[in-house]
From Swiss-Prot:
Domain of life: Bacteria
Name under which the protein is recorded: Glycogen synthase
Residues that, per the record, bind ADP-alpha-D-glucose: 15
Known function: Synthesizes alpha-1,4-glucan chains using ADP-glucose.
Record's catalysed reaction(s): [(1->4)-alpha-D-glucosyl](n) + ADP-alpha-D-glucose = [(1->4)-alpha-D-glucosyl](n+1) + ADP + H(+)
Single GO MF annotation: alpha-1,4-glucan glucosyltransferase (UDP-glucose donor) activity
Entry EC no(s): 2.4.1.21
NCBIfam families: glgA, PRK00654.1-2
Any Pfam family matching the protein: Glycos_transf_1
Entry similarity comment: Belongs to the glycosyltransferase 1 family. Bacterial/plant glycogen synthase subfamily.
Keywords noted in UniProt: Glycogen biosynthesis, Glycosyltransferase, Transferase
Amino acid sequence: MRVLHVCSELFPLLKTGGLADVIGALPAAQLAEGADVRIILPAFPDLRRGIPETVLVREIDTFAGRVALRYGHYRGIGIYLIDAPALYDRAGSPYHDASLYAYSDNYQRFALLGWMACELACGLDGYWRPEVVHAHDWHAGLTCAYLAARGRPARSVFTVHNLAYQGLFSAHHLSELQLPAEFFQIYGLEFYGQISYLKAGLFFADHVTTVSPTYAKEITQPAFGYGMEGLLQALAHQGRLTGILNGVDSDIWDPQSDTLLPTRYDAENLQAKAINKTHLQTAMGLQLTESKPIFAVVSRLTAQKGLDLVLEALPELLALGGQLVVLGSGDTTLQEAFLAAAAEHSGQVGVQIGYHEAFSHRIIAGSDVILVPSRFEPCGLTQLYGLKYGTLPLVRHTGGLADTVVDCALENLADGSASGFVFNECEAQALVKAIRRAFVLWSRPKHWRHVQRHAMRLDFGWQLAAVDYLSLYRRL
């Protein structure tokens, strides 16, 4: 089966979020299952540098001018790069400028991504033509609209990684993008008077997936649907909405082989994890002690991630004898609040603003608990990394967090299924109660190690998701 993934990021060459991790792992897992998989992306500078050897497939005229399609390989996967320097040859983020303003021509930049994916489905590359086109998030949403406009030359799947980002643009761009005028309606890509690239993917795809079963249910409700819940309810009723859990790339995230760690370890050698803890405490200026559990945040610092709750719960966490480590960037108010906490609680709170992939590995390996108190979380990868590294996740019961972490309630401890700590209400007091339960388990080292070992043996590998996606493709 020939499958084309359409997206805007690829780990490790270009990453702004979890989407890149998915595209860096899922196609390879599908290839291992026997599929013929390729990826199409805009030729952003980081991607051009990472895939320097490419050949010209075709040059064609598009609504955005003359565009070249190039082809190369990265880690055994075929990669198409859309070579349009005027649109894509910009340093930094693929979405916004240095002042964090979204590029004014994003409507054109990401429409071209969908256009070129559709052209491949129509035979642009004489040597390879996809049977299934799999588009990811709003950046690739128009792919499904262009395929519909061209008579559906391939089956299409659209995956929502985060419904909050909807790709909204002015309606007057419709004719410029060469989309049929009749597509601009409620039963189409119109959303409150604008074009929504996300809605285009949802409406015109043959099948829609999300990145966890629970999130697939949540987004049919007004609280999580961002105005799309009616359409999503209809898709669910038609059997065209499925939740498939993301996985962990064990080539990158595995404490047994992770070269970014001071010391590698596994479930049978947890003493070595303590060495990582000492290194982390030193790096973050924390008091050197094995007796205090380290709670960690590795996240975008936003309200969605529930990090205001962490700030509210921090006095109790410290009073109970814990330490806190934070790595991330985002909302200025949250950044300043965490930095102030680090200054006030020197030796017990360490904060690093920004994101460093290598350091994130060392934090997850060196911590005892990873905090993911999200208000909503389509899947979440951080808690999966925590499980893999024996760093018990403390999460809110939402989205993929609900699907992957089993609370350390007495009955779950008794049957051996417990893997972390789960709270329900999106309130600081609920988080505090979960933190207290973490300290209760921490006070029983034998039980803590038992839960750690169980968590580390859980299988959230990409092969499971790869098989589920391939099975879905065959049903289309």
